[in-house]
Design a protein with these regions (language model features):
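Glycine-rich phosphate-binding/catalytic subdomain of phosphoryl-transfer
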Residues: 2-120
Length: 120
């Protein structure tokens, strides 16, 4: 979900849990494949999607005390809320002569981990 006018793109991690609990079992049942023949399930986040968790790996946004805290939710790769921090990082790298055009295309995007983490 994008918060209008903010550049934020957040998601509820319960979506992933619901897929594991409801959608996958239904898909397996409809497929006719025996669950004994399934050796694994892959899960992937687009780089860089961040899922903050507590010490028990519970997503922070699923805890009542954090529901209204945007930084507790999954930040999708398309989250641009850290553009200011990305600009600051790029300026510092430019001043220090550390921009690597081959690896980065010349700049750090607000979609990457470092600007999102720096914003905290």
């Amino acid at each position: 979900t994008e918060l209008t006018g903010t550049g934020w793109a957040l998601q509820n991690p319960k979506d992933y849990i619901d897929v594991l609990k409801y959608i996958i079992p239904e898909a397996v049942a409809q497929s006719g494949v025996s669950s004994k023949d399934i050796i694994g399930i892959g899960l992937d986040f687009t780089s860089c999607t961040m899922l903050p968790v507590d010490e028990n790996n519970v997503p922070l946004c699923l805890l009542v005390k954090n529901v209204s805290r945007p930084h507790a939710w999954v930040k999708l790769w398309k989250h641009h809320g850290a553009q200011k921090q990305a600009d600051e990082i790029n300026e510092l790298l430019k001043k220090r002569g550390e921009i690597d055009n081959i690896q980065f295309g010349g700049k750090i995007s607000s979609e990457l981990l470092l600007p999102k983490f720096y914003r905290l």
